[in-house]
C-alpha cells in the first residue's frame, strides 16, 4: 500500500505501524525487525573486520579514522565505568553501541522509501500491495529491545554468580538491605524487583524513544501535504540525530554499569 494509494491519514498511519509478520498472536514473528537487525549486525561486522584487516600505521583513511575514534571513545568509557577485569566488556560495549546506533539510524530514511519498494516487490510477486507491511527501524519494536535487554540480564546474572559464587549471589538477594533472616521474604522481593527492573527499563527506554521518533515522522508524512512536510521533517531529523546517538550511548553505558555492579564483591 503505497502512500498515494491510501485514502485517509488514519489508514496511512496504521499501515506504517504494522509489522511484516509470520504467525499469529503471541507466537507471531516480526520478520522485518529480525531481518534489519541481523542485516545491520552483519554490516557492522563486515565494516569493522575490513578496517581491521586493512589497518595501517601510516596515514589512515576516513573510514579507518572513524572506526578508530569510535573504538577509542568506547574503550575510554569502559575504562572509566568498569572496574573489574574482563576482556569481554569493551568488545561487548562496542558491539552494542554501533549495532544500536545503526538500527536507530534507519529512522532517518524517508518514511515511505523502503515500504514503497517492498510494496512494488510484493505486487510483482502477485500479492496485494495493500498488505505489504514493512517497518525498517528494529529498535522501534519492543521485541527487539527487550530481547537485547534480556541478553544483558543473562550476562549480569553470569557475572554476579562468577564473582560472588552461587552462595554469595543468593545471600545478596536474601540478606540485603535488611541483614536478618526474618526479613528474607522482604529482601527477596525488594532485590528481585530491583534486579528485574534493570533489563525491563533498559529495553523499554530504547523502545519508547525510538517508537516516538518513528511515530512523529509518520504523523508528519500522514497528516501534512507533501509540499510542507520538509518544514517539520528537516528540523526533527536534525534533532533526531542527537536522539539516536544518545540512545545508543545510554544503552551501552547502562549495560557496562550493570555489569560493573554485578562484578563487584560485597
Swiss-Prot record:
Gene3D superfamilies: ATP synthase, F0 complex, subunit A. It is a multi-pass membrane protein. Keywords: ATP synthesis, Cell inner membrane, Cell membrane, CF(0), Hydrogen ion transport, Ion transport, Membrane, Transmembrane, Transmembrane helix, Transport. F-type ATPases have 2 components, CF(1) - the catalytic core - and CF(0) - the membrane proton channel. CF(1) has five subunits: alpha(3), beta(3), gamma(1), delta(1), epsilon(1). CF(0) has three main subunits: a(1), b(2) and c(9-12). The alpha and beta chains form an alternating ring which encloses part of the gamma chain. CF(1) is attached to CF(0) by a central stalk formed by the gamma and epsilon chains, while a peripheral stalk is formed by the delta and b chains. PROSITE patterns: ATPASE_A. PANTHER family: ATP SYNTHASE SUBUNIT A, CHLOROPLASTIC. HAMAP family: ATP_synth_a_bact (MF_01393). GO terms for biological process: proton motive force-driven plasma membrane ATP synthesis. Its main location: membrane. Pfam families: ATP-synt_A (PF00119). It is found in: Cell inner membrane. This is ATP synthase subunit a. Belongs to the ATPase A chain family. One of its GO terms (molecular function) is proton-transporting ATP synthase activity, rotational mechanism.
Amino acid at each position: 500500500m503505497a502512500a498515494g494509494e491510501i485514502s485517509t491519514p488514519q489508514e496511512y498511519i496504521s499501515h506504517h505501524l504494522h509489522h511484516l509478520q509470520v504467525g499469529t498472536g503471541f507466537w507471531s514473528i516480526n520478520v522485518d525487525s529480525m531481518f534489519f537487525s541481523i542485516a545491520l549486525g552483519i554490516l557492522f561486522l563486515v565494516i569493522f573486520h575490513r578496517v581491521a584487516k586493512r589497518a595501517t600505521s601510516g596515514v589512515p583513511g576516513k573510514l579507518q579514522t572513524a572506526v578508530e575514534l569510535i573504538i577509542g571513545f568506547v574503550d575510554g568509557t569502559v575504562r572509566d565505568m568498569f572496574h573489574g577485569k574482563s576482556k569481554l566488556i569493551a568488545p561487548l560495549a562496542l558491539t552494542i553501541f554501533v549495532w544500536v546506533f545503526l538500527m536507530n539510524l534507519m529512522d532517518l530514511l524517508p518514511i515511505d522509501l523502503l515500504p514503497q519498494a517492498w510494496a512494488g516487490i510484493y505486487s510483482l510477486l502477485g500479492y496485494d500491495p495493500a498488505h505489504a507491511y514493512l517497518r525498517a527501524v528494529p529498535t522501534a519494536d519492543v521485541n527487539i529491545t527487550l530481547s537485547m535487554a534480556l541478553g544483558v540480564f543473562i550476562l549480569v546474572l553470569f557475572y554476579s554468580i562468577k564473582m560472588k559464587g552461587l552462595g554469595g549471589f543468593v545471600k545478596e538477594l536474601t540478606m540485603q538491605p535488611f541483614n536478618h533472616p526474618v526479613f528474607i521474604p522482604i529482601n527477596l522481593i525488594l532485590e528481585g524487583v530491583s534486579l528485574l527492573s534493570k533489563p525491563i527499563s533498559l529495553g523499554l527506554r530504547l523502545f519508547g524513544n525510538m517508537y516516538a521518533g518513528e511515530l512523529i515522522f509518520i504523523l508528519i508524512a500522514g497528516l501534512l501535504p507533501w509540499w510542507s512536510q520538509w518544514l517539520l521533517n528537516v528540523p526533527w531529523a536534525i534533532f533526531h540525530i542527537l536522539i539516536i546517538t544518545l540512545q545508543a550511548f545510554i544503552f551501552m553505558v547502562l549495560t557496562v554499569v550493570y555489569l560493573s555492579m554485578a562484578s563487584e564483591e560485597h
